[in-house]
């Protein structure tokens, strides 16, 4: 199906200007006038790509860790109304039994999406926030469930997910984390560092091993000090992505 969007403010060459767009099967095929089966008047609105939320624990009153299929549907529909068209399901550190249950529910929802989910954000995969995190900066994580890296456990989770665990948050100072990052990458996961009071050198070691992002930068993280740059200094000095809690 083709759609022509008219009168919207489109971001082009560094500025927003009123342009027309023609989309076919969800992809932009023209930034000029063109014929289409459907015309949408975006007057007074900005036209931007859908947002991709790589770290979210739910929405519309539904917690991912406790979500069933109806819950995942509710989250996806809510996100779509807010301009988020794709997302990762972030699983808080939980028991092995509950983590596997949540993984299976997420995978089931992904499979159901293949049959079409109108007005529902696309679930791209899973983000594991833990369990290889520092107790000192645990935030909302249950401390008794935080452990040192266990690649066999992670492999079991990834197999249950059918390879759909895309992203994992770890704390650099937890014993064994820097040495385990390449193993996590080999399992098909992007690695983020966070929930951490790591020193500058340890954080950089993780970045050099392949960590590509910082989880909710500034939050649950030791902040910059003139004599102790810590993880914050390494994150800001490097070229890794920085998540932000924007409220």
Model region roles, listed by residue range:
Residues 4-5, 22, 47, 53, ...:
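Conserved beta-strand segments that form the floor/walls of ligand-binding pockets within enzyme
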Residues 1-48:
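Histidine-rich, glycine-flanked metal-binding segment
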Residues 30, 37-43, 102-120, 204-205:
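Short amphipathic alpha-helices and their capping/turn segments at secondary-structure boundaries
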Residues 45-67:
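Di-metal (Zn2+ and/or Mg2+/Mn2+) metal-binding site signature of metallo-dependent hydrolases
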Residues 57, 73-105, 120-134, 161-173, ...:
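Divalent metal-dependent hydrolysis catalytic cores, especially in the metallo-beta-lactamase
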Residues 8, 26, 44, 55, ...:
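Divalent metal-coordination and catalytic microenvironments
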Residues 136-145:
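Glycine-rich phosphate-binding loop of ATP-grasp-fold ATP-dependent ligases
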Residues 109-111, 147-215, 221-242:
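Histidine/acidic residue-rich metal-binding segments in metalloenzymes
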């Amino acid at each position: 199906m083709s759609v022509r969007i008219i009168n919207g403010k489109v971001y082009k060459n560094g500025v927003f200007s009123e342009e027309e767009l023609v989309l076919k099967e969800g992809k932009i095929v023209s930034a000029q006038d063109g014929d289409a089966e459907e015309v949408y008047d975006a007057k007074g609105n900005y036209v931007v790509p859908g947002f991709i939320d790589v770290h979210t624990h739910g929405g519309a009153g539904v917690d991912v860790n406790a979500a069933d299929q109806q819950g995942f549907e509710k989250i996806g529909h809510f996100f779509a109304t807010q301009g988020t068209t794709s997302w990762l399901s972030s699983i808080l550190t939980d028991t092995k039994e509950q983590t596997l249950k949540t993984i299976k529910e997420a995978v089931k929802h992904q499979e159901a999406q293949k049959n079409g989910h109108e007005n529902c954000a696309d679930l791209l995969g899973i983000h594991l926030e833990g369990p290889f995190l520092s107790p000192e900066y645990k935030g909302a994580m249950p401390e008794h469930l935080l452990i040192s890296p266990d690649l066999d456990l992670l492999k079991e989770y990834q197999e249950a997910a059918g390879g759909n665990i895309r992203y994992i948050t770890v704390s650099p100072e937890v014993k064994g984390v820097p040495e385990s990052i390449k193993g996590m990458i080999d399992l098909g996961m992007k690695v983020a560092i966070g929930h951490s009071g790591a020193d500058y050198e340890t954080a950089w070691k993780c970045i050099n091993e392949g960590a590509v992002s910082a989880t909710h930068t500034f939050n649950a993280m030791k902040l910059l000090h003139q004599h102790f740059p810590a993880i914050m200094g390494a994150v800001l000095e490097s070229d890794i992505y920085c998540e932000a809690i924007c409220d």
